[in-house]
Amino acid sequence: MLLSQTSKHYYLSFVVLLLFFSTAVKSKTSFDYFNYIENLQSFSASFSQYTYNEDDSLIKKSNGNIIYKKKSKYILEYLKPNKIKFISDGQFLTTYDEDLEQIIIQSLGNNQNQNIVDLITNKNLIDKNFEMKSYTINGENHIKFTPKLKDSKRNILLLVIKNNEILKISFMNDFEQSVTMNFSNFKKN
């Protein structure tokens, strides 16, 4: 009879734990990314950017600031090691390289909405170009964007959000280098 009572106790404990974890899993997956980006009209942040080559050795560390508003309007400013500023009004991209004393103005034309921030904040671009999966680790929402095109499979984007603040973006740049941007002082809208 004692074994039976003990078995019931373990079984009941197991059921309670199972219910607890199934509720926890449900709450972990309740982060609605599309709702988040729909409400993200603008943001500003400081960042540290780390660029790595194929053998994962650090090539470059950069620091700067970003101010972003929907419709491809942004100011992305690198402060260290080189002072470079990218300014987009949604139609043109102006690049100012202070060290080279050079300004380049480009029409965004068909490349509109192809910058990293637009790729992860535009629902239509996400639906068209990526398969998206999200999961939670230590209270952080990790959103993984895998390109639908087979030749782009290496260009996976990873976005980390906690407490409605973007903490990190990781991606491959045009030179097949791994880039991680860690954000601080994130302010939205």
PLM feature segments, named:
Residues 125-189:
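Gly/Pro-enriched, hydrophobic low-complexity segments
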Residues 13-20:
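Bacterial N-terminal signal peptides
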Residues 61-63, 81-82, 152-156:
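Short, surface-exposed coil-to-beta transition loops
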Residues 47, 74-78, 93-96, 145, ...:
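Short hydrophobic/aromatic-rich beta-strand segments that constitute the beta-sheet cores
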Residues 2-13:
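Bacterial N-terminal signal peptides that target proteins for export
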Residues 21-62, 72:
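N-terminal leader/targeting segments and the immediate start of mature chains
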Residues 100-140:
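Flexible, surface-exposed loop/linker segments and immediately adjacent secondary-structure boundaries
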Residues 65-114, 176-179:
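An acidic-aromatic
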